Amino acid sequence: MNAKGKVIKYGNNVDTDVIIPARYLNTSDPAELASHCMEDLDEKFTQRVQKGDVMVAGKNFGCGSSREHAPISIKASGISCVIAETFARIFYRNAVNIGLPIIECSEAAKDIKDNDQVEIDFDKGLIKNLTTGKTYQGQPFPEFMQEIISADGLIQYIKNSLS
């Protein structure tokens, strides 16, 4: 599994309340959630995000309230992957469960700049900054977790396993 796109970068401690504000939790429609993704942190996010873009952030990405709405809004906005120094554990699990590819790599998250072009090889955990030519080694998921993400999330993975 691979991803390639332009970087949209954020800092440390980006919490689920700014990823998708609580006032929008009354819907589970991915398109509606995407239209409000990051709006309290970055008013222009929905205007500048393109399908395939890669979100890069610092430490503790997705901290705060446990809500699947956060990774759903990111995925539905067109983001193909999130790279961070670290993820809050509940966000990490929710991202896998809904099929949003994520990867931890402190060095990449620190070095990569907004608007850089990056390519991610999830099987190897490799992140290549196509703008600078630098390559980083991230932590790849175990095979079974990659299968869940590739299946578009845990529910579809289970459905596929039962059929």
From Swiss-Prot:
Protein name, as recorded: 3-isopropylmalate dehydratase small subunit
GO biological process: L-leucine biosynthetic process
CDD domains registered for this protein in UniProt: IPMI_Swivel
Recorded family membership: Belongs to the LeuD family. LeuD type 2 subfamily.
Subunit note: Heterodimer of LeuC and LeuD.
EC assignment: 4.2.1.33
The species this protein was found in: Ruminiclostridium cellulolyticum (strain ATCC 35319 / DSM 5812 / JCM 6584 / H10) (Clostridium cellulolyticum)
Reactions catalysed according to its record: (2R,3S)-3-isopropylmalate = (2S)-2-isopropylmalate
